[in-house]
Amino acid sequence: MANNMTDTMTKFDTNNDSASLQQNGNKAGQSWFERPIPGIKQQLIAQLTAVETEPSTKCSSCHSVITNTALIFNCYVCPHCDHHLPMSARERLNWLLDQVEGELGQEFTAKDPLKFVDSKPYPDRMAEAQDKTKESEALIVLYGKLRNLDIVTCAFDFRFMGGSMGSVVGDRFVQAAEKALADKVPLVCFAASGGARMQEGLLSLMQMARTAAAIERLRIAGIPYVVVLTNPVYGGVTASLAMLGDIHLAEPKAMIGFAGKRVIEQTVRETLEEPFQRAEFLLKHGVVDEVVHRHQMIDTIYRLLAKLCSVPNVDAQ
């Protein structure tokens, strides 16, 4: 009798437990972790959906996927491997300047005097680059305030036909140098270019001489000219404005040279080992003055300009 009663009670308790589980929405074999808690599941789904739908970028070094919001917040430096990803010209300048007072050179537009055609006409290439970057040319020039310093600054946009230097790029750089000369303020240039623009032929090559002459006028007047070498800098830009600064800074692992590694190897018939043409290699051989992490770049530029211009360093006060 006692045994029958115990069996009945056990069965009753088991039935109650089953009913309770069904009431809580659990199925057979479902663990406590899988039990739905009101509100929590919906929040998790919303968060996961937001991450999946937010625009992301894959790091070209470690291949990690980074949301664009996180990338912008970290100055386009990979939070996983510290690789420096490209920045657009306008983002660089807005990032550098505390106050933008104006832009130079917007009146200059590219012409096609050679009627150059490779796989497509030059005007078509220009239109594609303008649509891609939302910029009219490969060089952007702004002037404004870096803390307590007035400066003129320019930056190449490598997305615009490889940051190539044509007549408009030359015009804008010369105008930037003339503005710095007239106002007696420093000029800072962020270089990122594949070199002279082949679609403009000799007109493009002439910009090397024009920009060099403009920099020489700054030197004679004692106006500081600082160059930041980003990845990559090659060709006619390296052979002119990018290597004529008073101070040369470089971002980590930036590729810097005149001809590319493959061209040099084919010419000298030797294999060139890494880190040939990297910023660190050039620092070791005295070509650049300092390799600076992007997070320290603004402070470094300001510190150098404050010293060169003999103005009080507000960071030191």
From Swiss-Prot:
Q: Which family does it belong to?
A: Belongs to the AccD/PCCB family.
Q: How is the cofactor bound?
A: Binds 1 zinc ion per subunit.
Source domain of life is Bacteria
The record lists the catalysed reaction(s) as:
N(6)-carboxybiotinyl-L-lysyl-[protein] + acetyl-CoA = N(6)-biotinyl-L-lysyl-[protein] + malonyl-CoA
The record's annotation in Pfam families points to: Carboxyl_trans
Matching entries from PANTHER family are given as: ACETYL-COENZYME A CARBOXYLASE CARBOXYL TRANSFERASE SUBUNIT BETA, CHLOROPLASTIC
In Swiss-Prot or TrEMBL terms, this protein is called Acetyl-coenzyme A carboxylase carboxyl transferase subunit beta
The gene name on file is accD
Where does this protein come from, organism-wise?
Answer: Psychrobacter arcticus (strain DSM 17307 / VKM B-2377 / 273-4)
